[in-house]
Amino acid sequence: MIALYPRLAYTSDDKQIYHSAYGMFYDGTVVCAGYALTYSAILNYLGIPCKYVISDEMSHAWNIVQINGKWYNVDLTYDDLYMTLGENAHSLIAHNCFLKSTAAMSGNTGIWHKGMSYPDGITCDDTTYDNAFWNDINTNIPVVNGNYYYIDCNVNNLKFNIVKRDKNGNTSLVCNDTYMTSGQRRVSSNPNNSSDKHYYNIFYSPLIGYNNRLYFANVNY
């Protein structure tokens, strides 16, 4: 199911079209409601139970999905790094809110969701995936021939490894720190002190699975 994590463009535009799944087909742009309705449509079409969840307290919407008879939270909006990085978020997808329990999504130790209202008396108590391997991965995770693939990037030098992970959790490197990722050196400035600047790296290289092959891009290709 992780391969079905869609990457749309989040917007703060409050037009009604962006509150619906149609916004995705119109111009690939949605608000939280559009994200949740799109994901529900995709998963239910594929036979994966998925429901729409709201929080009036947060004025926010996301999903719960059922895996092996248990329900988990999925919030694509919070995992859309465009919200925090804007146009610098190209090719980046977070997974911090993917298949999480209620405890992991709320409270001081969670991801600050509150006022959750689950339909049909559903609870999301299972913690199986709260500490899953994808938590720290900010790239797409394609599935090719039954194996997961993702980019492990060294943000200090923008070199990256492509990691293969099988269904048993065994990992191996497809390439070892060979490629320089497409990236950018960013500056964070203190608006009250022009000399107070902090530098950090972000990376953009996409990783895509298609027809049982992996495709990626770096600064040389």
Task: Please provide the spans of the model-predicted regions.
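Extracytoplasmic/periplasmic, Sec-exported soluble proteins
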Residues: 24-35
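Hydrophobic/aromatic-rich core segments of domains that either
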Residues: 33-100
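His-Asp-centered catalytic microenvironments across diverse enzyme cores
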Residues: 70-183, 201
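Recurrent small/Gly-Pro-centered beta-turn motifs in extracellular repeat architectures
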Residues: 152, 218-219
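Repeat-blade elements of multi-bladed beta-propeller folds
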Residues: 205-214
